[in-house]
Amino acid sequence: SASVQCIFLADGKLTENLFMKVLILSTGTGEGHNSAAKAVKEQFEKRGIPCELADVLNFASDKAGAYGRRIYIWSTVRAKKVFAGAYRVGRAISSARLKSPVYFANALYADKLCSYITENGYDTVVMPHLFPAEAMTWLLRQHKLDVQTYFIATDYTCIPFTEETKVDYYFIPHEELTTEFIKRGIPAEKLVPTGIPVSERFLKLPEKREARGQLGIPADKSCILMMTGSMGCGKHDGEAGGADRRGYPSVYPGGNQ
């Protein structure tokens, strides 16, 4: 993927990959982060580079990790107005100098994460999620840790609290987001437009007619695929109803089932 190639270029390790050991940190608050993490891991492994994918919240405790995932999913699916309000508040209280409660919450497990990184000899940390980026920012301010750090943005915006992180490079979904990230305080020289990492298997897809046959979708009918984010966010109910009235067959996948 472009993100992995840029990591090699930044580290100067295109021909020295034997000295590279990668830790990818994500968490289960929305599966998109994990999908990006798995895609990056796939590319490192393809190149024979030692790589591990870990849930950063498990460094706090297994219970805390499970709790954090449940609260996030509840807030986005069951309490959308509350979540939207939190994002607005986040924009107001967070800056490169003023740190949010999210930053300090992730600092609580940073020492344990630091021990894990040093004991296992990782020299590269990749983060397709805000939480580990917050933890690593605190960690690097408190400890002299010789690692390269990379944040992968998996939203087509600069989400709240990104500006209070400090890592080596930020991989963003599109060059048109560059100005937004700069306005939020991310240095321009640290921004690398790479797109969002996806698995290589999406490059080897069946023909449309064959795929429809596998899914039981009529080959001669129009079909709309609706995709939402954060475990079901979005005004999809009304849109789905409109599609039904126009006579389109509809497919509603969800919950990773």
Q: What is the predicted function of each stretch?
A:
Residues 141-204:
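Active-site-proximal region of nucleotide-activated glycan assembly enzymes
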